[in-house]
Curated annotation (Swiss-Prot):
Residues that hold heme c 2 according to the record: C232, C235, H236
Binding site for heme c 1: C125, C128, H129
Catalytic activity: 2 thiosulfate + 2 Fe(III)-[cytochrome c] = tetrathionate + 2 Fe(II)-[cytochrome c] + 2 H(+)
Subunit structure: Monomer.
Annotated Cytochrome c domain residues: 99-196, 219-305
Temperature dependence: Optimum temperature is 20 degrees Celsius.
Listed GO MF terms: electron transfer activity; heme binding; metal ion binding; thiosulfate dehydrogenase activity
Record PTM: Binds 2 heme c groups covalently per subunit.
Protein name from the UniProt record: Thiosulfate dehydrogenase
UniProt KW keywords: Heme, Iron, Metal-binding, Oxidoreductase, Periplasm, Repeat, Signal
Protein function: Catalyzes the oxidation of 2 molecules of thiosulfate to tetrathionate.
Amino acid sequence: MKIIPYRKRSVLIATIFAISAVGITGCSDNTETKAVERVEEAAALARVKDLEARAEALKSNMPAANDMTATAGGTDTASGKPTIKMPDESTIPDDEFGAAVRRGLQISNHTYKELPNNVGNQLNCTSCHLGNGSEAYAAPWNNTPSVYPNYSKRTGRINTIQERINGCFERSLNGKALDLNSDDMNAMVSYMSWLSQDMPFGVSPEGSGFVKVDKTLEPNTDNGKKLFAEKCSVCHGATGEGQYNDDGTYVYPAIAGDKSFNDGAGMARTYTAASFIKGKMPFGQGGSLSDQEAVDIASYFTHLPRPIKANKDKDWPNGDAPKDVRR
């Protein structure tokens, strides 16, 4: 079913209004007005019928309020929401904006190599934002530009998209913020905008964020340690140190230790990490763990030694911090 352009919606509204107006005029009781001649009545009735037919034709092509099937990025038929999709790289324009998009993609996939002065570990943006930042249920960036500026409970104020990106640099990348007006910051925002080209403004695509887990579950860290050894250590190492090539690039990223994110990162929170694990881990086997197993594993590895985020006491200034926030 196709989305009707705004102008057609306006025509429909005007048509319905016209029908109502004709009906009201025909029913008005004005003793000073002579009765409408039969021929005029017939003409008025014909106009009403014509308007009704046009209105029905428009309504038959108009989707329900949540029907987004005309989205170019694809649609999840169950939810009616647009789906996450990496646009074809051939659509990147051959101009200054396109150059910024390509730079943003390069930074996203090779962050600590491209920006060594801003990254304090050996991770990339796409260590968590999988698939070039465009994989469903791996915190994809598709449509991210349309939700910022936005209120952040963690900072207690409105944040711009640039400030949100810098939050990741200071926490997930254990590094330093980019200059808000730098070419590299603009490149990252440009890349996110390009990713979002097929997304309707203000609509959360199917696959945004992470999968949901039951946050009422109490973690069993001992079981998490056992499961980590069985299901996670083969890639991430016995202590979460990851596997790295001689040139410093990783085969599997560190999820603990100095090469990993600090304790102020979202991924250092038990239930946030559990949501990522449930949807995407073990690698290639996402969805194979129960909520309880994901929570147990997350509780174990998020509390392994890792860098300490300075000034965490200033987070959540209004006292509404989730229970898994590190202090």
